[in-house]
Amino acid sequence: MTQDLADMLTRTARLIAGDGHAAGLKPVQWQALRYLAAANRFSRTPGALAAWLGQTKGTVSQTVAALERKGLVARTGDAGDRRLVRLALTPHGEALLASAPDTIAEAMLAPMAPADRAALEALLARMLGGFLAARGHRPFGLCANCRHFRRDAEGGNPHRCALLGVPLDESDSRAICIEQEAA
């Protein structure tokens, strides 16, 4: 890889990471909010957030505490496992994300032709996936694209996670999951 390419990737990542500054958030706080909005109910935990961000649990704990103080995130205990902490966006956190202008990434991608965007997405997915796999990190991914996803498996809930043995609704299937394994 050339140094120019590495520099462009780094600069692009830094510009995109700065999205939350207008809302008074540090880049990691903005990324945490965006993750919690995109993650399924099983993946909204401090441990999953740490894995997604590539940070230590201690660092993520400080990030979550700051977001709690700002009224953007709430912690709750899990009814089935009292050792487990669940994270959720508060209505204020949801409103902040909903009112955010187009992201820097969206502005960068907007002038690109659809074929170029698709090619870039495929290359970045391969690059990121290879990097994560080589280091033993979880890849995350959409629930509906997982090998454990069973479409139309339940009467009241249309789908099922065969790994966790739980019913899934449509919102679960469109969210990212820490347990996701490519189908």
Indicate residue ranges for each PLM-predicted region.
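N-terminal leader segment of winged-helix/HTH proteins
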Residues: 1-23
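Short amphipathic alpha-helical boundary/capping segments
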Residues: 15-26, 107-115
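Mid-protein regulatory/catalytic core that forms ligand/cofactor-binding pockets
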Residues: 132-183
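Terminal interaction helix/tail motif
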Residues: 99-147
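N-terminal helix-turn-helix DNA-binding core of bacterial DNA-binding proteins
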Residues: 17-56
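Charged, amphipathic alpha-helical coiled-coil/dimerization segments
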Residues: 66-118
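Short alpha-helical DNA-recognition segment
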Residues: 26-27, 63, 71
